[in-house]
Amino acid sequence: MAAVKTLNPKAEVARAQAALAVNISAARGLQDVLRTNLGPKGTMKMLVSGAGDIKLTKDGNVLLHEMQIQHPTASLIAKVATAQDDITGDGTTSNVLIIGELLKQADLYISEGLHPRIITEGFEAAKEKALQVLEQIKVSREMDRETLIDVARTSLRTKVHAELADVLTEAVVDSILAIKKQDEPIDLFMVEIMEMKHKSETDTSLIRGLVLDHGARHPDMKKRVEDAYILTCNVSLEYEKTEVNSGFFYKSAEEREKLVKAERKFIEDRVKKIVELKKKVCGDSDKGFVVINQKGIDPFSLDALAKEGIVALRRAKRRNMERLTLACGGVPLNSLDDLNPDCLGHAGLVYEYTLGEEKFTFIEKCNNPRSVTLLVKGPNKHTLTQIKDAIRDGLRAVKNAIDDGCVVPGAGAVEVAMAEALIKYKSSVKGRAQLGVQAFADALLIIPKVLAQNSGFDLQETLVKIRTEHSESGQLVGVDLNTGEPMVAAEVGIWDNYCVKKQLLHSCTVIATNILLVDEIMRAGMSSLKG
């Protein structure tokens, strides 16, 4: 009897073989759910929430976040896979598949009496060797636009259908190249993702400027200005209550009038400063002048600005203030005391677009924008969500490629190369740990197998063809998902991120090892002691 049972008769315990069986079945259950998602030919999953909201997705990360997983081991694997996505932006589904397969292969040997500890030693040796192989086969190359487009396309085609992926690829790569600075880390927050429920998903485009999700608040303001100066400020142009809730006392109506006038004058002086600056820089020319303010602008101030032909937007989001100055230039101001023409940015075109109840302000034709907007369009909400998730992963894939300075061939080529190298390496490992290396090599082959299976080909036949081709030609051969035949991934331009594969090897081995070494599962929390 388990020791914990003596202390707490209500505790649930699974021991040795039973504990392992519970864990392996959890990993395989999760693997079966995500198996059909892998690769560009993977299928969709429809998630229906308790409130009846529908989400259509192929992205493993979204699935694992949205699914309610009860089983503790499955939940642990899901957390590891989503952490993989947080770190590298890709490889979630592969992570779950490889962990499930490592446990499945290990189970074959354990059922024949091999101790889990010996298998885990083999796993560790195999991981070290696999990382060496990865170092050898990575391709260091100049990250030009062509290469980045191949990397982004490989990532995006696994998330959305091919036609849309090709549209998004160009937009994603161009947005990264626009915000990239020499020898500085890439800040993906400088790419704003704005959604419009409008037209079809292939109308998604890159705006070399900014799109704000609100418009001017005065009917007389121009809807379109060209060659515009942009003033970004965080100054209140409305009367605000004091922060400490203090009040004023006045003896008579005259005093109250004076007080109101003083308040009004205080705001009007600020508006006058803006108007004077506009007259100074625009003169009699028909150049536009746009004020974008993070705080409020009251109706009187809006009226005064509209009379002067100034377009004013109030309550802009804080994240957009930083992007604005990067896109248009200029300096954001917290006070109007040191207002001068050097503080102004410039945009070639500013216009307002109305879509149903919503208004959007486009700031375009900026001279060298360091911040851009990806305008996502789609007919309904779940299409927009799906595209946004895909774009996020696409942006990360391009960023990783630039940061790594190298890429690895995709289409299962890396996994086949590692598996073949491990089988040769096996004979140099001492003792029974060889079996762990063999299990690791077999587990890696799940990726090309599932890619072939999801494309409708016989998985064993395809795998045999690829392995034969690999050993004969010595090239990095992957699966051609259109024909089921072997192909050289590098020639076709199918590239994966190096850091994704590296992270994959580390996290899968650690989690599979930990799960194999569990020989007792106890559910003996405080709740079990009640009653």
Swiss-Prot record:
Binding site for ADP: 39, 91-94, 158-159, 411, 496
Cross-link Glycyl lysine isopeptide (Lys-Gly) (interchain with G-Cter in SUMO2) residue location(s): 251
Residues holding Mg(2+): 90
Record InterPro entries: Chap_CCT_zeta (IPR012722), Chaperone_TCP-1 (IPR017998), Chaperonin_TCP-1_CS (IPR002194), Cpn60/GroEL/TCP-1 (IPR002423), GroEL-like_apical_dom_sf (IPR027409), GROEL-like_equatorial_sf (IPR027413), TCP-1-like_intermed_sf (IPR027410), TCP-1_chaperonin (IPR053374)
EC category name: hydrolase
This protein's UniProt keywords: Acetylation, ATP-binding, Chaperone, Cytoplasm, Hydrolase, Isopeptide bond, Magnesium, Metal-binding, Nucleotide-binding, Phosphoprotein, Ubl conjugation
A UniProt-annotated Pfam family: Cpn60_TCP1
Compartments, record wording: Cytoplasm
One biological process term in Gene Ontology: chaperone mediated protein folding independent of cofactor
Modified residues (Phosphoserine): 205
Reaction(s) catalysed by this chain's protein: ATP + H2O = ADP + phosphate + H(+)
GO cellular component terms given for this protein: chaperonin-containing T-complex; cytosol; microtubule
EC number: 3.6.1.-
Quaternary organization: Component of the chaperonin-containing T-complex (TRiC), a hexadecamer composed of two identical back-to-back stacked rings enclosing a protein folding chamber. Each ring is made up of eight different subunits: TCP1/CCT1, CCT2, CCT3, CCT4, CCT5, CCT6A/CCT6, CCT7, CCT8. Interacts with PACRG.
Protein role: Component of the chaperonin-containing T-complex (TRiC), a molecular chaperone complex that assists the folding of actin, tubulin and other proteins upon ATP hydrolysis. The TRiC complex mediates the folding of WRAP53/TCAB1, thereby regulating telomere maintenance.
Protein name: T-complex protein 1 subunit zeta
